[in-house]
Amino acid sequence: MQNEQELKELVREKYSQIAQQEKTANQSSCCGAGNCSTEVYNIMSEDYTELGGYNPDADLGLGCGLPTQFAKIRKGDTVIDLGSGAGNDCFIARHETGETGKVIGIDFTTAMIEKARANAEKLGFNNVEFRQGDIEHMPVGGNVADVMVSNCVLNLV
């Protein structure tokens, strides 16, 4: 049986592999970098394509819903996304907060943070940032966020 740290490292390794492979490879692999299955990662994935702020490069198909849908995000809010991955939900939240708001994505995988930062840079967003860290010990101060969202991550903690 794996201890907590070994399990955490396994999850980190798998998500790193996902971040580093081509998006088309992600769609046919359920367990990392490689074609081990013809299934998609998540059969419950919602259709983001019509949402404001959607960016296909940030959508790795890893979520299981639309966490911003019921979050009541307002213009000017500061939003934290726990387990932000390549930034998909952050960019949608950024659309809702507008230019006066701020979105902070937190992920514990270096490769996901790098991918998310590259996506934000391509989009020219200056009010979306990505921080590496564990959500159990978030790399943010207290009383920072108006809204917190997470998409299929808390089950991994």
Which residues fall in each region the model found?
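Conserved alpha-helix/loop element of class I SAM-dependent methyltransferases that forms part
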Residues: 37-78, 88-96
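Conserved SAM-binding loop
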Residues: 116
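Conserved SAM-binding motif I beta-strand of class I
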Residues: 102-107
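A short SAM/SAH-binding and catalytic strip from SAM-dependent methyltransferases
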Residues: 146-157
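N-terminal auxiliary segments of SAM/dcSAM-dependent transferases
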Residues: 1-41
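Conserved SAM/SAH-binding beta-strand->alpha-helix loop
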Residues: 109-111
